[in-house]
Structures are given as C-alpha cells and as structure tokens.
C-alpha cells in the first residue's frame, strides 16, 4: 500500500492529462528497471504478538533504530511512519507490517542484494528490541482484534470504509503480506501485451508462492488464504480486469476503469479528507462533496491510482500483485520469475502463446481455484502444476538470454531454483508448513515464528 505521492500539484483540467500520466511511463528497453516490494510481519520474541506502534518494543522504535543505516525519517503528525534512502523506502502497512519498496534497479542480482541488506539491517535493530520478523502471506496466529493499527490518516479512512464493501477487507489490511515486482514497458502496445500475459499468469504465481494456510492457529482450508481474501475485499477495485483482454484496450480504457473506482480520500495540506465512495469524475467537475469547488491535481490522481487493487495494476509501470510473501530466496524469485517472462521478447512471445487462447471463464477458474488448490487445481486435462512448469521454463530461458551476470559470471536464472524445486516436488510452501503442523509441530503454529523467521 503506497504512501501519499509527491507529484506536481498541477490541476487536472482535461481527461487527456490522466492518459498522459500512464503514457509517461514508456521507456526504451535499455532503461527498463526492476522495483521489488515485500512486506513482513513483526512479532515480539517473548509472546509472538505483533508489536504496537508506540513503546520501547514498538514499530516506531524499530524505524528510529534503522536510521543508523542512513535512512531518512518521514513524519506524519510528529511520528516517524516511514524511511527513505537512495530511491528506496520503508513504510508501514495498516497493522505495522514492515514494507521495503526497493529502488529501481537493473538486475535481479542487485534487487536480491538490496533485499538481503534490508533484512540484515532489520534483524540487527529488531534483535535489540527483542522483535522478530516473519515472511508469510497471512498472519498465522493472531485474530483481527489482536492486530494493532498504525497512526496513518489514509488507513483510518479505509478502516471505516472497508466493512461497507466486503467481509475481508480489514483482514487484507491488517493480516496479509505480499511480495510484488514493478516492471516497465516500451510502448502502449508493449504494455497491453505484458498486462495480458501477467494477468493470465498471475494465478500461476499465486500457486507457486502459496504460503498462507493458517488462520488463528489452525489450518484454514486454503493454501493462499491471502489470495482468497482479495475476492471479498471490494469488488469495485479488485479482480482480473476482463476488459484488458478486449479489443482496443489501452491507456484510455484503463483511465476509464480508474475513474469508475470509488475514491478513498484527497490529501491536502497534510490532511486526509475522507472522500470514501465518492467519484473522481465528480471531483474533476469541482463537485466533490468533501471539497466543494476544488479541482483534483496530478497528486490526487497519483494517489487515486494506488487505491485500485487488481491482480495486476498499471501506474507508470505494471505491478505484479498475486504472490504471498515468503523467505529471502522467494523474495528474489518473484521478481526473477516476471523479469524472465516479460523482459525478453522471445519469452514474452512464448508466454503469450501459452495463455492467448484462455477463455474468460478459464482465467476466472484459475484465479478462483488456486487459493484453495494451488498447483493441484485441474486445468485442461492437466493441472496448474503443468502450467507452472511451462511458465518457469519460459522464464528461465528468458533470464538466460538476458544474460545479466554477477561478479562470478552467473546469470539470473539461478534465482528460479527455488521455484523449480516447488514445481518438481509439486508441494507449495503452504503444503510443507501444513505437513509440519500435522507432524513435528504437534498441531501448533508457534514453531513457524522460530523456524521461518528472517
């Protein structure tokens, strides 16, 4: 979840400006970059509870501790709520899940080092505060009521609005963690092709990375409960975006979609004005009830773009949003998977060949089925595991052709070894944890905090 943007306060007088924001993301291939984001759950080592914001063991104390590594604090109402350094940021999700939004980097080698460096810094400070951090898709032990709330104006508005539009939106906010990657496009046509491929294959990523099988200490019947949660959060701003596959799709059609997504807020002069459920189209006419007469700025539009949560999201780049969070190796594998598919022309063509004849019903069956069944979901006489094997194969070939090597001469394809192992075994991370729960853990989720912490 993004923090308020800092785009120019240019007033919006014409819909064309909104289209130009998306078009301004176009970059030649040599300028394509990789932006990886991941979230993680904090817990107190003594009782495994999530830390509150305040206090000697609190999230603010952790953020303050991280400033020793050169991070610059960002404050809201006098409280440190985020950190900035060299194009990267550390921010807070609603219940204090700690998010690293990485800088725009050139290779997976760089993004994996960036993630590892961050995890090391967090571990050092967290250890002093007797905190730990866990990478999974859903909080395995604590109830919604057990989760603290961070003091951010945006989240206060969303917290009151979510229960009006879905049963599980508050769980999405407080009890989920994801890993995602942001990738570039060269032209509108390139964006469309990448958008279609990544939407169709997003359920494959959900299956491969499935790691949220527990709710409140018990198996919940899902392998990616985090993915299921998005199906009952807010239908106006989530889903598989069928219109992306329609003839004529492009920037204009996506702008129309965003204009139909109800607003959450307008951020003016350091204040979040609650505009939940109101229309950005009305805002453009100066008819926003909460700010009568005011016209939106490009900052308002940039903020509004972050309040849509489809499986793949377009801003000035494409965001892959389907995967559960996990350990360091999978935080490197997720961007590698998508870079291999989308940043090599032959791989992108092969991926499109794989999915181009999927029907709308099939795309929805994949999206709706993988949260529960993951790789074992039946599909066209085989299973999702077969699709995943092919997608991983295409991605590995794409990374080999990309041939971005580290100092030891290795290309980026090695980052997919962890996915190859999941495909070969047919076992998702969630299924491995369920086996431990029913075996060595003796029906307790508590060992997950020791055995799978960063």
Where in the sequence are the language-model features?
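Conserved aromatic-histidine-acidic binding/catalytic patches
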Residues: 28, 107-110, 114, 182-186, ...
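Loop-rich catalytic cores of soluble enzymes, especially ATP-dependent carboxylate-amine ligases
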Residues: 127-128, 132-313
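Charged, low-complexity interaction regions
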Residues: 403-409
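Terminal catalytic/cofactor-binding subdomain
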Residues: 1-167, 175, 210, 330, ...
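Beta-strand elements of well-folded, non-transmembrane domains
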Residues: 42-44, 104, 187, 324-326, ...
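Long, well-ordered mid-to-C-terminal structural blocks that present hydrophobic/aromatic surfaces
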Residues: 278-362
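Structured core elements
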Residues: 41, 180-184, 319-321
């Amino acid at each position: 979840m993004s923090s308020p943007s800092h785009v120019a306060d240019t007033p919006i007088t014409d819909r064309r400006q909104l289209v130009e924001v998306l078009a301004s993301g176009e970059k030649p291939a040599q300028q394509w970059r990789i932006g990886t984001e991941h979230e993680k759950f904090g817990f107190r080592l003594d009782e495994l509870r999530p830390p509150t914001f305040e206090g000697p063991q609190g999230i603010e104390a952790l953020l303050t501790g991280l400033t020793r590594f050169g991070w610059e604090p960002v404050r809201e109402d006098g409280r440190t709520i985020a950190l900035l350094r060299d194009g990267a940021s550390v921010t807070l999700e609603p219940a204090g899940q700690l998010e690293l939004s990485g800088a725009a980097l050139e290779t997976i080698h760089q993004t994996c080092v960036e993630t590892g460096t961050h995890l090391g810094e967090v571990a050092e400070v967290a250890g002093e505060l007797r905190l730990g951090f866990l990478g999974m898709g859903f909080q395995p032990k604590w109830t919604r009521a057990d989760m603290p709330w961070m003091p951010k104006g945006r989240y206060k508005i969303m917290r009151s609005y979510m229960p009006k539009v879905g049963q599980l939106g508050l769980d999405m906010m407080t009890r989920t963690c994801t890993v995602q990657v942001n990738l570039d496009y060269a032209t509108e046509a390139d964006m469309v092709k990448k958008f279609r491929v990544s939407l169709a294959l997003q359920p494959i990523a959900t299956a491969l990375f499935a790691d949220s099988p527990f709710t409140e200490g018990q198996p919940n019947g899902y392998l990616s409960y985090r993915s299921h949660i998005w199906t009952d959060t807010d239908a106006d701003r989530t889903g598989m975006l069928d219109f992306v596959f329609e003839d004529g799709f492009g920037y204009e059609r996506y702008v129309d979609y965003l204009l139909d997504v109800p607003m959450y807020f307008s951020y003016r002069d350091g204040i979040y004005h609650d505009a939940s459920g109101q229309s950005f189209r009305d805002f453009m006419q100066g008819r926003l009830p909460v700010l009568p007469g005011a016209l939106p700025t490009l900052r308002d539009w940039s903020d509004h773009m972050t309040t849509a949560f489809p499986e793949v999201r377009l801003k000035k780049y494409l965001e892959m949003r389907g995967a559960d969070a996990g350990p360091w190796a999978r935080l490197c594998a997720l961007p590698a998977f998508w870079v291999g598919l989308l940043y090599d022309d032959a791989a992108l063509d092969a991926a499109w060949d794989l999915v181009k004849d999927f029907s709308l019903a099939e795309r929805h069956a994949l999206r709706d089925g993988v949260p529960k069944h993951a790789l074992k979901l039946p599909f066209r006489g085989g299973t999702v595991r077969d699709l995943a094997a092919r997608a991983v194969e295409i991605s590995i070939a794409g990374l080999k052709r990309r041939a971005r090597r580290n100092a030891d001469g290795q290309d980026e394809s090695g980052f997919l070894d962890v996915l190859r192992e999941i495909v070969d075994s047919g076992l998702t991370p969630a299924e491995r944890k369920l086996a431990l729960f029913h075996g060595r853990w003796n029906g307790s989720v508590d060992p997950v905090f020791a055995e799978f912490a960063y």
